[in-house]
Amino acid sequence: MGEGKLSRRAAGWPSSTDSTVIEMGPGAKGGAGIGDAMPDAVTTHDLMAEYKVPMDVFTYHYYNGISERLESVMPAGHWQASQAHTDDYLAMAGLCARSYAPIRDKYMPGAQMWVTESGDAGGGGNTWGSTYLDVLRTLNELGDFATATDGIIFHNTLASSDYGFLEHGTFNPRPNYWAVLLWNTLMGTTVYDAGVGGHVYCHSRRDGKDGYAYLMVNNDLENTMTVELPGEGTLYALAGRDGMRSSVMTLNGKELIAGAKGELPDLSGVTVSGSVEIAPGSCAFVVV
């Protein structure tokens, strides 16, 4: 009840006179993933009904589940590594966003939604959170979230525990770091209907040129996904160097490892046309 009491007190605070301040809340949890395994002391509707200050951004926290560290405490919230590529697992982030969208629309119509804390699993992340296996979830979360709402996802954390984008102590980039870097480099901010099922997402190009940038997540570990391009495109194919739980990711077959002084590796794509095969368990960006 502590969170609820704090939020109720804050609800009566006067609005800031600083025009640069963004009012946001309520920092909710639930709707899918870890939230479904945690009882609600105060509901999101209860919190929002108390606010007297108009807010600019609707916020919530989201994790896909509970890590191995907390499995014994909250077994219903834990996913096994064997499930981390499944449609059910990958669907959780989008389900959460869509469960909050009607609440946002009721109390803050037109506002963005910000996920102010997110990761693969609460409790430090799963042991595979630092490997290529979690890239499928990370990229699919970005793609699916963008089809549900305009907003921002804040990842927890940069360099701590299993879900850190950087390895603690060495600061060496992990697979998710490169995946998100490529997302931000290639995928623009205008979202289109990809027109197909599965885990395929279509945006404008980040470079501002005419055309489209696609993200394709082939979460089938046995079958290849085949894509027909209308012309030439640029392919950025991602895979685990040594399998799904590899600590090193490859881009078009080349290892993504930072240099001794932190230099970025070559992140260039390769030119493709006609039929493009997306290997089992791999992810790909295609810019056309």
Predicted regions and their residues:
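Noncatalytic carbohydrate-binding groove/subsite architecture in carbohydrate-active enzymes
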Residues: 1-135, 148
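Short, solvent-exposed loop/turn elements at domain surfaces
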Residues: 68-69, 243-248, 286
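Mature, folded catalytic cores of secreted/periplasmic enzymes
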Residues: 47-50, 98-106, 110-113, 121-133, ...
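Carbohydrate-binding surface patches
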Residues: 198-243, 280-287
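Glycine/Thr-rich phosphate-binding loops of Rossmann-like dinucleotide-binding domains
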Residues: 68, 163, 224
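Aromatic/acidic polysaccharide-binding cleft in carbohydrate-active enzymes
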Residues: 112-205
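Acidic, Ser/Thr/Pro-rich beta/coil linker or hinge segments at domain junctions
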Residues: 229-278
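Structured core elements
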Residues: 59, 115, 154, 213-216
